[in-house]
Amino acid sequence: IRLSLVGSEMCIRDSSIRARCGVEMVAHLTCVSSTRETVRARIEAMHEAGVENVLALRGDLPAELAGADRSAWPYRYATDLIGDLRASGYGFCIGAACYPEVHPESANQREDIRRLKEKVDAGCSFLTTQMFFDNGLLYNFLYKIREAGITVPVIAGIMPITSATQIERAIRLSG
């Protein structure tokens, strides 16, 4: 379930699914180019709707913002969003994304793991990987993050393939 500008409606849908089906849901909250006020409103809406689990993501940069100066943005990284979720005091179980094949904006895996550690230190309780195609890369990644002191659970991100277009888009977005 993604939260949009009408986040409270999406949160209510999330709570309804949990109540009817007994299935824990994880709200996906993105913050790319968002204001603190917008994000605070979404956090409040999630809390009021009884959302407990949040996957905190920066989100994909829209094409028109690809070259923009992001230095003044309140949410340059998911870490900023994780900090605000934790500071809300609502006790969300906060997850974040990780990249066994290195985030496309990272210079290298060492930098990527350093940023991942920052997410965990900011209050992330679990990680879910981006889609990957080589189990060896995942095992190597898990070894390296454990070596870096990252001990939270890691969930392998699995996406059922339904079309060639879907997989091509996923590959483009994940670098």
Name each region found by the language model.
Residues 72-99, 149-175:
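Active-site pocket-lining/capping segments in soluble small-molecule metabolic enzymes
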Residues 1-7, 11-12:
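Single conserved hydrophobic/aromatic residue that forms the stacking wall/gate
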Residues 25-37, 95-111:
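Active-site mouth loops of central-metabolism enzymes
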Residues 105-122, 127:
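Active-site glycine-rich loop that binds ribose-phosphate moieties when present
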Residues 25-29, 54-56, 94-98, 120, ...:
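Hydrophobic faces of well-ordered beta-strands that scaffold small-molecule active sites
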Residues 31-48, 72-76:
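Glycine-rich anion/phosphate-binding loops
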Residues 35-45, 113-115, 139-146, 163-170:
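Catalytic cores of alpha/beta
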